[in-house]
């Protein structure tokens, strides 16, 4: 396995197993690691490794915006769900990529929406 991929996978493994040890980037070009993480949509998880990169400020701002969006969606979901339950309206929260099969046009399924099933 190429050192770039080994380092990338070790960083992700450490994140998933709560190991706080930073992974040394020996022999790995930080720009190549940045491009790999960008390709796999995992840049926010590798943020500490890019502090010396010119894109760091922009990436940090993007990460903050992404987190804010997730928190807003989480709040909206909880609020909507609690309002329906308070009115004794049964509902089921639908999550996951499998929902995309139910949309005739993939663009109709955007991130940031709330999918609920309310039985008749």
What are these regions (language model features)?
Residues 2-95:
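Helical scaffold of the NTase/Pol beta-like nucleotidyltransferase catalytic core
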Residues 79-114, 118-120:
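Active-site nucleotide-donor binding segment shared across nucleotidyl transfer reactions
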């Amino acid at each position: 396995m190429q050192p770039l991929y080994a380092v990338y996978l070790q960083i992700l493994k450490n994140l998933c197993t709560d190991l706080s040890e930073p992974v040394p980037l020996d022999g790995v070009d930080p720009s190549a690691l940045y491009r790999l993480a960008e390709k796999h949509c995992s840049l926010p998880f590798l943020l500490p490794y890019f502090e010396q990169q010119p894109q760091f400020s922009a990436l940090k701002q993007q990460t903050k915006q992404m987190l804010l969006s997730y928190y807003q969606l989480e709040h909206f979901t909880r609020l909507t769900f609690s309002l329906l339950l308070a009115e004794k309206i049964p509902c089921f929260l639908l999550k996951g990529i499998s929902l995309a099969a139910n949309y005739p046009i993939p663009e109709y399924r955007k991130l940031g929406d709330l999918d609920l099933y309310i039985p008749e």
